[in-house]
């Protein structure tokens, strides 16, 4: 017996091998009407991976990705300016993301469950995030991954020993940091952006504001570094006439640029002295505490919420020196003003105040629940059906959140259960293959299989299989083609056409149809003898042998005319030759006709378009031929007969030849980066298709409840509206699109109604003839024999006619109601559901007729008008004394 640890599981496979296992083992056990949850059709990708490769973002929710980018920008700025965190192992520079190789400062409280998975199929930053998540605490992983808590209560508050500031607002921090076109300055934190070849106006204004506080000795170096002179000329600013800087804290119009100097430039450029009320301030820390407190006064309470231990006072002491250099300590106390001491951690708190200010004037980010971060409750996961469990575990990485020592960790769900821990939430990461999530590919594949119709199998060959010659003429022409060789292209075309015309003139008999087995050989010989470049490629698609014949240049009528004119033929002569050889030319031009777009899309990949330098005739004619593979060629007979034991026979892939071709096709689809579920379906061999079940066998539909839902609208007089309502009534149990099915069923009822109304009209006419004869007899008695027939007799006869028409119409309604119920049952059965009604009642018949009545209303009105006409005609001939005593009433 094989050891359990040596069994290969799906999470250990990648690319085509993984997708093949999914399609061949998981897909056949899903019903065709299986619904894939919309939340599982997208996945999570780290924004850094998306920045490096935009195509990776196609498998994510765009609103969720944008929210993560905003949150990640905030967390990155907090992390890089902090002295303690340093959780990110990257440095974001202009246009690139540099990975830091030194160990990351992560928590010493590592996950007690050891992670043994590598996740090599994931992009690098997503893979790294996942490794951090399964190693460190869940809280730190969420900080690095840009997690945002969703609206609502269906999420988990993770436990952690220490938490970091959680700010949430729309921003473009990451885009600004990664902006490519910036000035290459030694100070990397400040990005001086270049727009249209010149320093941006916003950055220019900020740099000019900072420049006024830089000493005169350092200003030239500052100007050269940031191309201040060029930008000043561009914006019409004269640097020599700039006003003198205001360096007194009591009269400064703004503290913004002084704070910017402290944030970015303090280590590279010297600053001019700063004064308070004419006295020079001695200590830089007091200057920054004063300026930042004054500029962000309204945000100090918000700062205290995040950092309760930060010192906040109602005054600040500035150590200054007066003009005589005497020490003067100034205590600044202003009404309703607080002063914060940022503890010499200037860059972090300046950055954090900027974040708080941005938060104050921005909108908060709102997101929905993330299957990757929030997941679902473990009890909800356990309550899922076996089908759902199988699908989720085979198409997604499945993680679990659990608590240990008052800390929340994340691990592979199976590892948590093996470690006898209790999961709280189950998080899912759908896998990606070929640029699409596997969950979405499976959904598309099921839809493609479900939407196929019986008419598509087998597909009849619509190609023209003759060239207008009898069998004798065709054999003569075939022999002549074999003699054509090594002649110029134009000459060869002319000689072949003329040879055909010569044989055609004396040919008699019905056209000889080319046999299928000889078709490809004749095609190759015909075009090669004319000097075309003919190449053949063969492959396997599904359970069919595919032959692709490429003919260059492309064969068209205009090309043949032009080529004949190059061989000294006038245009009239060329037209006459083409007219005489119409059947041959029609055969040549039509061989590449495609009536199935998907087949063309698939087959075209086997024969890529060629490019010709300077040639206008670069396109080619593609001929595709498909032949089913024989059952013996589909089976691995050698593997079966070489097996000596039951285990060896069980391990043999019986359909190895076509499965191997299927893997190769999947690999090619994945490499193209444009794989779809329809691609997989077209390449799927019959041995897999034959094993797919049509329905799960658990969906039941009540015909009465369904009719109740459908007949809630009384104005449904169009087929499309009825179709929509039927689909809506079935939407809770099936996922297939039944529009075509419903339309066909209702149209069949309408056609049946037309036939039945014809039968009803004929029977009514025959019965009306009896009443007409009876009315004629009464008329004769009264007019010829002058005997009076009382009105009661006449009224009785008319009432009997009315009863006859009512019974006929009632029978007609019952018949149509039954036909409509048959159509409903057909729709339900074809949709993969069962009927759970014990019996169909009279009320169901009434509902059924009410549903179809708008479609047959014109026929009902026709029958009523016809019956009314007979009634009024008889009533007129009866000449009743009281004509109003009886009347014809319809519905």
Swiss-Prot record:
- Post-translational modifications reported in the UniProt record: The precursor is cleaved by OPG083 to give rise to the 62 kDa mature protein during virion maturation. Proteolytic cleavage of major core proteins OPG136, OPG129, and OPG098, which occurs at a late stage of core formation, is required for production of infectious mature virions (MV).
On whether Chloroplast is a keyword of this UniProt record, the answer is no
Where is the site described as Cleavage found in this chain? Answer: 614-615, 697-698
Q: Which domain of life is it from?
A: Viruses
Which residues are removed as the propeptide when the protein matures?
615-697
Q: Name one Pfam family in it.
A: Pox_P4A
> Which keywords label this protein?
Virion
Which molecular-function annotation in GO is an example for this chain?
A: structural molecule activity
Disulphide bridges in this chain? none
What would be one Gene Ontology cellular-component term for the protein?
A: virion component
Self-association and partners: Interacts with P39/A4.
Instruction: Give the function comment from the record.
Output: Core protein 4a is the most abundant virion protein. Major component of the virion core that undergoes proteolytic processing during the immature virion (IV) to mature virion (MV) transition.
Q: What is this protein called?
A: Major core protein OPG136 precursor
Which taxonomic lineage does the organism of this UniProt entry have? Viruses, Varidnaviria, Bamfordvirae, Nucleocytoviricota, Pokkesviricetes
């Amino acid at each position: 017996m094989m050891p359990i640890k040596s069994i290969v599981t799906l999470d250990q496979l990648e690319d085509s091998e993984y997708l093949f296992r999914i399609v061949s083992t998981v897909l056949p056990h899903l019903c065709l009407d299986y619904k894939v949850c919309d939340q599982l059709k997208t996945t999570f990708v780290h924004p850094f991976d998306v920045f490096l490769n935009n195509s990776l973002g196609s498998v994510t929710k765009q609103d969720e990705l944008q929210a993560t980018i905003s949150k990640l920008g905030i967390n990155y700025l907090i992390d890089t300016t902090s002295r303690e965190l340093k959780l990110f192992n990257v440095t974001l520079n202009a246009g690139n993301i540099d990975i830091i190789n030194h160990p990351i400062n992560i928590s010493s409280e590592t996950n007690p469950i050891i992670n043994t998975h590598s996740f090599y199929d994931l992009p690098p930053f997503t893979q790294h995030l996942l490794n951090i998540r399964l190693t460190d605490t869940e809280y730190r992983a969420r900080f690095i991954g840009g997690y945002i808590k969703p609206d609502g209560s269906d999420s988990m508050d993770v436990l952690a020993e220490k938490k970091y500031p959680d700010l949430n607002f729309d921003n473009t921090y990451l885009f600004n940091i990664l902006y490519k076109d910036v000035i290459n300055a030694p100070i990397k934190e400040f990005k001086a952006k270049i727009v249209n070849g010149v320093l941006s106006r916003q950055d220019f204004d900020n740099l000019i504001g900072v420049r006024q506080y830089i000493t005169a000795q350092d200003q030239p170096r500052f100007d050269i570094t940031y191309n201040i002179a060029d930008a000043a000329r561009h914006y019409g600013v004269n640097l020599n006439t700039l006003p003198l800087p205001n360096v007194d804290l009591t009269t400064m119009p703004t503290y913004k640029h002084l704070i910017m100097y402290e944030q970015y430039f303090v280590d590279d450029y010297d600053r001019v002295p700063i004064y308070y009320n004419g006295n020079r301030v001695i200590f830089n820390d007091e200057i920054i505490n004063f300026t930042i407190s004054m500029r962000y006064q309204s945000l100090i309470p918000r700062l205290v919420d995040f950092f309760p231990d930060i010192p906040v006072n109602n005054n600040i002491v500035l150590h200054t020196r007066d003009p005589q250099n005497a020490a003067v300590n100034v205590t600044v106390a202003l009404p309703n003003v607080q002063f914060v001491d940022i503890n010499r951690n200037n860059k972090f708190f300046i950055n954090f105040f900027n974040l708080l200010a941005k938060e104050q004037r921005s909108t908060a980010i709102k997101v929905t629940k993330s299957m990757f971060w929030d997941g679902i409750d473990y009890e909800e996961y356990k309550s899922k059906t076996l089908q759902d469990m199988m699908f989720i575990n085979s198409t997604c990485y499945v993680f679990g959140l659990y608590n240990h020592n008052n800390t929340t960790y994340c691990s592979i769900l199976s590892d948590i259960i093996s470690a006898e821990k209790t999961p709280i939430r189950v998080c899912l990461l759908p896998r990606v293959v070929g640029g699409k999530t596997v969950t979405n590919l499976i959904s598309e594949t099921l839809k493609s299989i479900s939407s196929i119709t019986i008419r598509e199998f087998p597909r009849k060959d619509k190609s023209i299989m003759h060239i207008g010659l009898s069998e004798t003429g065709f054999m003569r022409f075939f022999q002549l083609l074999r003699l054509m060789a090594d002649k110029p292209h134009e000459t060869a075309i002319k000689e072949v056409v003329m040879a055909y015309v010569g044989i055609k003139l004396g040919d008699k008999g019905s056209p000889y149809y080319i046999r299928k087995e000889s078709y490809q050989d004749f095609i190759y010989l015909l075009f090669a003898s004319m000097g075309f470049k003919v190449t053949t490629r063969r492959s396997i698609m599904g359970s069919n042998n595919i032959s692709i014949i490429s003919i260059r240049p492309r064969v068209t009528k205009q090309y043949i005319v032009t080529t004949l004119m190059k061989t000294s033929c006038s245009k009239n002569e060329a037209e006459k030759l083409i007219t005489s050889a119409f059947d041959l030319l029609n055969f040549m031009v039509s061989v590449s006709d495609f009536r199935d777009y998907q087949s063309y899309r698939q087959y075209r990949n086997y024969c890529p378009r060629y490019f010709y330098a300077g040639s206008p005739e670069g396109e080619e004619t593609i001929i595709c031929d498909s032949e089913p593979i024989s059952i013996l060629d589909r089976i691995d007979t050698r593997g079966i007969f070489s097996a000596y034991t039951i285990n060896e026979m069980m391990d043999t892939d019986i359909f190895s030849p076509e499965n191997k071709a299927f893997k190769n096709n999947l690999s090619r689809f994945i490499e193209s980066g444009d794989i779809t579920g329809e691609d997989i379906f077209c390449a799927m061999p019959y041995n897999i298709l034959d094993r797919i079940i049509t329905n799960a066998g658990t969906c039941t539909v009540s015909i009465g409840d369904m009719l109740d839902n459908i007949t809630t609208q009384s104005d449904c007089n169009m087929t499309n509206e009825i179709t929509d309502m039927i689909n809506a009534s079935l939407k809770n149990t099936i996922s297939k699109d039944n529009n075509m099915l419903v339309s066909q069923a209702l149209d069949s009822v309408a056609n049946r109604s037309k036939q039945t109304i014809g039968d009803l009209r004929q029977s009514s006419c025959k019965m009306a003839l009896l009443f007409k004869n009876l009315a004629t007899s009464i008329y004769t008695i009264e007019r010829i024999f002058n005997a009076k027939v009382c009105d009661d007799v006449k009224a009785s006869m008319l009432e009997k006619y009315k009863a006859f028409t009512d019974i006929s119409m009632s029978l007609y309604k019952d018949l149509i109601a039954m036909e409509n119920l048959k159509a409903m049952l057909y729709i339900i059965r074809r949709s993969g559901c069962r009927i759970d009604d014990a019996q169909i009642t009279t009320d169901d018949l009434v509902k059924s007729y009410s549903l179809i009545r708008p479609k047959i209303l014109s026929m009902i009105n026709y029958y009523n008008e016809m019956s009314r006409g007979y009634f009024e005609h008889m009533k007129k001939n009866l000449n009743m004394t009281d004509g109003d005593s009886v009347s014809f009433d319809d519905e």
